[in-house]
């Protein structure tokens, strides 16, 4: 009897163990959603549908006669925009495979926007054109990899052709023309950007903010702007605007924290003896030292202010060196054996005026040697070229901008929040396009640079017929920007494309705003080479990947499980 009972217990343990394993496996499977797999023509066809629907929404914004797109937002009023990348980002499809296609086009638009800052609509319609032709060719039995090689060869040839025809720009008028085109023909925006670049230089910082009036305004901050304000409000000298204003001040630049009274006594004596205001820039000013500065300001009448040095680590130290060069002073650092108690007048910097608010400090007209400042700028430019980190490059460019040109603020005005938002989108595009044009030069606008580059592809030799078809795919795609701009202006796009290809003037194009054929360069209708080049390269790259796709894996939609009724009844039972 005892043996029988122990056998039952053993079986029960095995049963429980088996049940636990089954439960474990079933819970593991519940953690992973079921997948749906699409193959071949069906997969590419569904992807293409997503690409086409997104491209149709984006392409209506292209050109001077392009239309607005209204986007519903999860909060606030709907957004009205003519910015291609904004439209693309807002689109999401319920169908998972369609969404894969749309997401890849968004990737193209974002990549183009990140590199060139404009050209997202052009990149989107090029992607659609290349992928559409690629799908047809693969369905007809072409080798997808040979098509891709042909597409790559054609793109390389077009980029070389565009670079050979690019013209560098330098005058304010040319800069204004680029800005005007990218702002959908609004001349005022183009001129505003040209004025800003004239004021702060091509490497200067230009920022965009909301204006407080109906009109667009340009505010220029000459000199260096530090993102740190006064440590204590006791340093304020102008109660009306709550700022500390120092004229012809001495500037102490120190790498470490200042904590003892003795550390600030010597520099205060120098300021008092010279009857000049004093600014202290350091990692921090603590307790006793801070109290000493405030007491001297309140009782002895010395105009003094202290701010924390902006940045962290090596970036902070480098920024302080820049400030020392700009103001003609020295960075007081323990590494060189310097001591605050032995500071003399030659170690202090100077400038014409400093304005310090609770948030920032603006140093105007530093007393540094112009040659030393230029040498420091060259060092930073060299460091930018050698740097491989995007973060480091960004910080170096900020330092260069502060040293070389100052800061311009474009204040965008309008009658409503929606109008200001729409104008800011266009100003951002125009500013990015202008910077790209200054960097790599310009080509005739309105899509004609790509259109005429398609002629050169007739001479391109390929290894086989399928590669030749790849070249023809790019040839046909290069016609779509002109076709789309003309169509949005209410003209038959194919007629405009045909007429332009019949003649030999590489600068002749269709001015959609006026409805006539003009010399695009003379008319000021120009595109930055960097924008056109980036749009084509990114579009061809992603389109080629989609064309060579043979399977797509997506999640199946989850089944909605019936929720049991509350109270006495059971879910799903009728009485």
UniProtKB/Swiss-Prot annotation:
The keyword Nucleotide-binding appears for this protein: yes
Gene Ontology cellular component list: mitochondrion
Entry superkingdom: Eukaryota
Any GO MF annotation of the entry: ATP binding
Localisation per UniProt entry: Mitochondrion
InterPro entries in alphabetical order: Chaperonin_Cpn60_CS (IPR018370), Cpn60/GroEL (IPR001844), Cpn60/GroEL/TCP-1 (IPR002423), GroEL-like_apical_dom_sf (IPR027409), GROEL-like_equatorial_sf (IPR027413), TCP-1-like_intermed_sf (IPR027410)
PANTHER family reported for this sequence: 60 KDA HEAT SHOCK PROTEIN, MITOCHONDRIAL
UniProt similarity note: Belongs to the chaperonin (HSP60) family.
Designated name of the protein: Chaperonin CPN60-2, mitochondrial
Encoding gene (name): CPN60-2
